[in-house]
């Protein structure tokens, strides 16, 4: 697991942005420590973070990106 700071450095997303993405349900941390509220991310979530960044460069709104990610998850479930 990566702390929000470590994940921020790797993904090139600010910690503020990661907190916002969590708030709107776009990119939820893999784990939030109930004792201190610290957010932790799985290395596999980096793919999602990079996809979000790529879609933003194509001028998709965050709501559109959220829809794309939700449909992607449904497709992956159906294919497994």
Please place each PLM-identified region on the residue numbering.
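Polyanion-binding surface elements
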Residues: 1-17
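Conserved hydrophobic/aromatic packing and binding residues within compact polymer-binding modules
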Residues: 18-21, 52
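Short alpha-helical "recognition helix" segments of helix-turn-helix
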Residues: 7-8, 21, 65
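Short helix-start
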Residues: 31-49
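Arg/Lys-rich, alpha-helical DNA-contact motif
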Residues: 3-4, 43-80
């Amino acid at each position: 697991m990566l702390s929000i700071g470590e994940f921020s450095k790797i993904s090139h997303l600010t910690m503020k942005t990661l907190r916002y993405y969590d708030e709107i349900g776009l990119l939820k941390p893999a784990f939030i420590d109930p004792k201190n509220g610290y957010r932790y991310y799985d290395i596999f979530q980096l793919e999602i973070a990079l996809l979000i960044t790529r879609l933003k460069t194509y001028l998709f709104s965050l709501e559109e990106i959220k829809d794309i990610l939700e449909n992607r998850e449904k497709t992956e479930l159906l294919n497994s």
